[in-house]
């Protein structure tokens, strides 16, 4: 059995993975190495289990989005809360919740408000699928508490407020009793155990939630069987302690992804953790080299596995006469004016080219800023008016003019600025995409994974693990002045685009499915003779 411990942690509170209301989401691409690995083992029918340390009441929706619902889950908090292991998903509707008589509901584009006799009773927040995440209960316009719903149809916890700030959180047993009470003040994050549940814990109180999680995780890890089970840990500061809680005779894999686990030669604890693992997996040559700096012996057991998103399929862009360019925009470094002007000049020159400027949960202010920059460039450069769709000027007689008011209100350009809120939206957009452009100092990791997974060539300013120059992409070694050459290389001729597609397919086959599992198991045998 392969036990995978992911790093799906919260930012403010590490042991919390609570879903965010859709209108709050910011830069929340969820895909990572654990998702990639578990999908591969799932598709191959290998025995695997997700071992989860974190509190995650909306876990099933997350697993559904990542195509992982077929994988078994062992959850520390499910055990603590007495949730039956066979309990299925059950979406909660407004009518399932008890409301006082005469309660009315007001629906806004963002959430639902419950009122009674003109006073606010509750605010109901939903996720991207419309599933209810939380109920915020009010009294005299002040928050009493916030209830977190589990996606299996029950109230999982409550956060109580004092002086308009979170005071403590109660984690509820499946039958409704509170089990743990976690203080949320600046002075203390201690955890109290309900006297009725002392039997289930080793202590009556804990310094923090990490101590509770450590106790319960250790109980699970000590049940792993020598010679049968493998523990695959996502490298993350919160996960490293679990290596030491696992019997030394159990095979362990430590998986590095992006910059999730800082690598420093002075981090001796990490060094000993890496010694304890039989296999080290990385997603990049850069990380592999950084591990080698610690010790040559570590380099010998370090292997790179490129991650792919198997939800992406080879797209249908070749079925369109237009060529869509997917231009990733990092909101922390918007494209320069010269870069934008160059893109618009290319659009003006090639009538069948289209561009989608793509933010990932970007702030509305930054999205608007980019839109304004594009509008200003078009207004200031006469030739850039050619970026309008042909349909807007075709069919006009010599003496006809386009209605200026209409033109001002609804310009029909061959570019659009989009702000994507989920990976599924990105995947859908890429189905018709012919080329990806990312001019960031460090290209977006998920965009690169998605591009190669869909067989789409990519244009970048720097060399990366996912893009090889003139094979499945173009690296602008001479700067932005090569941008037109790079774009036309793949969009004006079919041969380079087809070669990039074939190259991507070969890379995918090398690091997915049965071939990857054989490599993985072969590396383990090398370490154990």
Regions found by a protein language model. Give the residues of each.
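Conserved acidic donor-binding segment of nucleotide-sugar-dependent glycosyltransferases
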Residues: 473-481, 489-495
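Short hydrophobic beta-strand element within catalytic cores of glycosyltransferases
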Residues: 457-460
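Conserved catalytic-core segment of nucleotide-activated headgroup transferases in glycan assembly
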Residues: 310-398
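Membrane-proximal helix-turn-helix segments that form the acceptor-binding/catalytic region
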Residues: 218-226, 261-279
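A charged, aromatic-enriched C-terminal amphipathic alpha-helix characteristic of glycosyltransferases
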Residues: 495-528
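Active-site donor-binding acidic/aromatic loop of nucleotide-activated sugar
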Residues: 394-397, 411-422
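Acidic donor-binding loop of glycosyltransferase active sites
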Residues: 426-443
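A short, active-site helix/loop in glycosyltransferases that binds the activated sugar's phosphate group
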Residues: 272-300
